[in-house]
Amino acid sequence: MISDEQKQQFIDEGYFILDSVLSNETLELLRGACDILIDRMHSEMDRLGTDQIHISHRNQRYHIAKQYAHVEGLKEYVFGELMADICKATIGKNAYLFYDQYVAKAAEVGRPFAWHQDGGYLGFPHTPYVTVWAAVDDMTAENGTVTLLPYSDVGIRSLVDHIRNEES
């Protein structure tokens, strides 16, 4: 599934793209899980009497973490063959789940995410890890896809200081 060219691109540039590798069944699972998790976030917002929890903003953007074991079917996706193949192709045969999250932006009114390196938020030295980003809806640059910064464009392979954007 992952070609030698994609593996080399990961080494050279820090990323590769697997286009249309999720089955319709998997997409439906991920979409349904996202809906369930957003409903749970709304319930928690209601309980707390707020429209914002951390960087989740009601009906605009949601950041929902560490829930793979709490929605039926997600565990099988997270620990399934596709993720195993990605891990083996990038960081080797020994991989461990470090963090799982949904980032969902509402159509037309979603909030931006500030540019960041995922590792920049950790604040401690760590072993290499891989971030897998899977779109569950059709996307374009205009409607909010992720933007990657290849090594060759940035000119370095190290972390940079992160400045929090209060608007995002």
What residue spans do the PLM features occupy?
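General alpha-helical segment detector with a strong preference for membrane-spanning helices
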Residues: L18, G120-L122, A141, V154
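Non-heme Fe(II)-dependent double-stranded beta-helix
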Residues: M1-E13, D19-W115, Y121-F124, D161
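Short, charged/polar surface micro-motifs in flexible loops or helix N-caps
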Residues: M83, A107-V109, D138-A141, V154
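Conserved hydrophobic/aromatic beta-strand scaffold that supports enzyme active sites
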Residues: Y15-I17, T131-A135, L148
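Double-stranded beta-helix
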Residues: A141-S168
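Structured loops at beta-to-helix junctions and adjacent beta-edge loops in soluble globular domains
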Residues: V21, K105, D118, A135-D137, ...
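Short, conserved beta-strand element in jelly-roll/cupin
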Residues: H116, G123-A141
